[in-house]
Amino acid sequence: LDKNRQTRILSVFEGAIYNGFFLITQGFLGTGLALEFGASEPAIALIGVLPSVSQFIQLLAPSFLRIVKSRKRAMMICAFASRLSTAFIPIALALGINGQSLLLTILAFFSLAASLTGNYWVSIIRDVAPLKGAARFFSMRNVIFTFTNMFITLFYAFILDLVPGRMGFILITAFGVASALVSLVLLGFHNDPPHEISHGRGLFRAVTKDIRFKPYLRFYSFWSFSIVITSPFFAYHELVNMKLDYSFLSILNVFSSLLTILFYLLWGKIADKIGSQAVLEFGVLGAFLKTILWLFMDTGTVYLLYIDAFIGTASWSAINLCLFTTMLDLLSGVDAQSYALLSFTNGASALVGSLVGGFFAAYLNRFTWMVGGHRFFGIQILFFVTFVLKRLFDFLEGSQDEKGGLCVGNGF
């Protein structure tokens, strides 16, 4: 078994186990954890987008790499810092120290260090993943993640319903910490092929001169901004306004996960035939269209969640698979510098979007009204805003593919 193949296999196990903690910070589990710490709507918005906002620190990735002189060493230092910090969450809950500022601080530190870890991991995996059939490799990797995430989510939801309140979150965060530490050990066995370390001059100038990459960069920043305005509040609406329990949400997650597995297999084969960009464009369209359903989500229309799950899994499986592989196609080589610029742009856009979304969510959720027997919540206005922004971007973007760039406007 050659070292590169061994690293590819390890990357699957490492990622699946690592999600034992990461899932606690996302979706309805992350929202529930934030509410357990007494988080307000703006704080929930920030917590929900910390993985994106933390990518500001990517600008330091090339400099740190030059200091330590090894991608693997840099990755392990950052991974050690991020995953060890997770232990403070169950400790804080056990001691009854549950202020939202503390949770924000812990998760911010975790996300910053994890963001740098991801930078070096992407650079390494680009050198060990097969150039031919990359989409199929990552689709199979994502299928395995979907299976493990499904069982982890069910397990955590079962604990939270069996042991409600603070004790339930102490238990699942303790499991999450154990997962994070095991994944750290597996990272240590990754192979780092020989790689020339760039001196990092002209970071913005070199990448933005690429006429194929510039439209992708512009699309990625607008995508991040418009998505994070609402992304933390879907689960918030389910838990607070619709008052759904964790068991139901976990069952819905199983339904979505099973569909996701099928779509990952489908998109992996299609992307290798027609290209990742075409599949990505379809996914983006579906992700925006599904937000319209959330205008009608309340306790009397729970069945719409299943329709939303179908559209969402078809769309997000395409996005999760092809957003990364499209980047691999557009960049001649995914080094720390080019990935840092992309991540910085994503972080800046996500920060602005989360601040805008958090501010309006705190204000809008005070209002409810009845129309034709249907109860509307003020926060649902934000869901419609995402769709409007997408159509506005299409109008402003126009024809962007004439010079070989990413077709954002005409692709739909």
Placement of each model-derived feature along the sequence:
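Helix-loop boundary and gating motifs at the non-cytosolic
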Residues: L1-Q58, P62-L65, K72, A87, ...
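Juxtamembrane intracellular "pre-TM" segments in multi-pass secondary transporters
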Residues: L1-R5, D192-Y220, G404-F412
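Hydrophobic core of transmembrane alpha-helices in multi-pass small-molecule transporters
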Residues: A16, S85-T86, N98-T117, V302-I319
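Transmembrane alpha-helix termini and helix-breaking/packing motifs in multi-pass membrane transporters
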Residues: T31-E36, S63, I67, P90-L95, ...
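Helix-to-loop junctions at the C-terminal end of transmembrane segments
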Residues: I57-R73, L160-D161, F263-S276, A361
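Cytoplasmic membrane-interface "Motif A"-like loop-to-helix N-cap segments
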Residues: I67-S82, M140, G165-M167, D272-L285, ...
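C-terminal ends and interior cores of transmembrane alpha-helices
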Residues: A79-N98, D161-L162, L285-G300
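Intracellular juxtamembrane helix-capping segments at the cytosolic ends
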Residues: A114-A129, A318-G333
